Amino acid sequence: MDNALIADENLKKPSKPAYYGTAGYRSKTSDLNNILCRASLIAYLRSTTFAGKIIGVMITASHNPVEYNGIKIIDHNGDMLDEVWEEYSDRIVNCDDEKLAREMKKILRSCSNQSELGEGVRGHVVLGRDTRDSGERLCNNIRSVLGKLNCTVDDYGVVTTPELHFLVRKCNTENRVVDKAEYMKNIAHNFNSLSSITKGNLRMMIDTANGVADMKLKELDGMLDGKLNYEVLNDPKGILNLDCGADFVKTKKRAPRLEALSSSGFSQAANRICASFDGDVDRLIFFTGPKDTEIFDGDSQAVFLALYIRSLLDRIESRLSIGVVLSYYSNNAAVDVLPPESFKVVMAQTGVKNFVSAAREFDVGIYFEPNGHGSVCFSQACIDEIEKGSTKSHAILKILANLFDPCIGDALANFVIFKALMGSADDLRKFRENPSRLLTVKIVDKNSIKVDQKNQVIEPKELQDKIDVEALSLGGRSFVRPSGTEDVVRVYAECPSEADADLLCLKVAQHVYDMCNGIGDHPEIDYTSK
């Protein structure tokens, strides 16, 4: 077995180190195949050391350009991979070829498993992928690698990332490989139930990011007998994430570059609201347009849901706790609109796990990142209470608890929820955002900047002093942090005016460039794309 692993070309050591970030591994280099195949070994190890529970392997690079791909490992309960196993994965991905089998055995022994590789409890892994051309080949190579370890592999084919989370969770709950259709049946059934109560099914235009969303919307519409009430704006031949998708809309602060957006049909459509997904359907951004584009990001979605769910709890006279978990990138106006006597607002560090763990501290925990990734967590105490009631408010809460994914943001589930609850774009206009600006700076080593839990720079301390002076002079706030998914430093600034927000962001970005060995072009704002 050891020799078989060493001889496998798919398992050769990558030329550069790779590390499991907030979105798993992502790359566009020639090492991509080997990084993903080595990382898939962790899914086998996690399964065989945990009574053969089914572990998920999702091949996707989400909102990244089409030439990228990546891998996310899904734990037995549908959660993201535990941090301890992330560290194990980095060891497996980056070790020398002759040490690969030895490192795998070390992990087995650390889990009190004395079996040899490929022996003992049989591992079980399920695969899924997005629509990238490279996905099928990568899945086939992973299947080949895992086959050498006597690991059972089932392939769900093209799925959304949240769909695979759902399927893994359901597989282990029912102790069987469930049919792929179970996911869509759950959404269709609950959407039908919710819209029949609220009488809502807001028509929306859709930006699919030229990704898997198009396929899944057609599948869902088929189950709903053509009643989903939507229109896709993308060209069927469009390139994944190119000038479109949730990340493009959010970061560029503009509507996607789609020919259909300039049509008279869209400009005259009632409410003119569009939902923009990302490549693997775990992010959702709403916008109006195409002219005078107004963007409703994760902050707007969180505030709408918080106020709506609060009203439901008030109607049933519930004393359940309700919390809203936002990001340090969230706009201060979103925090200010939530009354402190009704909500506990918590700020979480970037990374989905941080948001989910904070949300689970409440009976109802609403969490959203500004990028449109978010969900609502319901405690068992909350579910028990709402199950006892028979009012309309109880019924809506029961359905929401079934639709919102408890482990990860599901943009498709969120989409149908908003369709059923909203009457128009006005429902998302709960506050007026303070002007803000986000820039990225490339430096020699992004990890040379150390920040604490509140995004205060610890090293170099002089950088934080500069940030404080600039923020005070312009009456705003700003912070910097190394990106968890890209080799850049992110700079955020927020001020009472757009001009000051831009100026503050530029000044801080320049300090980062000057003090931390910036490389390439100096920071600047491109206004030509507006």
Curated annotation (Swiss-Prot):
Binds 1 Mg(2+) ion per subunit. InterPro entries: A-D-PHexomutase_a/b/a-I, A-D-PHexomutase_a/b/a-I/II/III, A-D-PHexomutase_a/b/a-II, A-D-PHexomutase_C, A-D-PHexomutase_C_sf, A-D-PHexomutase_CS, AMG1_III, PAGM. The active site is at residue 62. Mg(2+) binds at residues 62, 278, 280, 282. Pfam families: AMG1_III, PGM_PMM_I, PGM_PMM_II, PGM_PMM_IV. Its EC number is 5.4.2.3. It is an enzyme of class 5 (isomerase). GO terms for biological process: carbohydrate metabolic process; cell wall organization; UDP-N-acetylglucosamine biosynthetic process. Gene3D superfamilies: Alpha-D-Glucose-1,6-Bisphosphate, subunit A, domain 3, Alpha-D-phosphohexomutase, C-terminal domain. One of its GO terms (molecular function) is phosphoacetylglucosamine mutase activity. Its cofactor is Mg(2+). It catalyses: N-acetyl-alpha-D-glucosamine 1-phosphate = N-acetyl-D-glucosamine 6-phosphate. Pathway: Nucleotide-sugar biosynthesis; UDP-N-acetyl-alpha-D-glucosamine biosynthesis; N-acetyl-alpha-D-glucosamine 1-phosphate from alpha-D-glucosamine 6-phosphate (route I): step 2/2. Keywords: Carbohydrate metabolism, Cell wall biogenesis/degradation, Isomerase, Magnesium, Metal-binding. Substrate binds at residues 369-371, 481-485, 490. Catalyzes the conversion of GlcNAc-6-P into GlcNAc-1-P during the synthesis of uridine diphosphate/UDP-GlcNAc, which is a biosynthetic precursor of chitin and also supplies the amino sugars for N-linked oligosaccharides of glycoproteins. Belongs to the phosphohexose mutase family. This is Probable phosphoacetylglucosamine mutase. It comes from Encephalitozoon cuniculi (strain GB-M1).
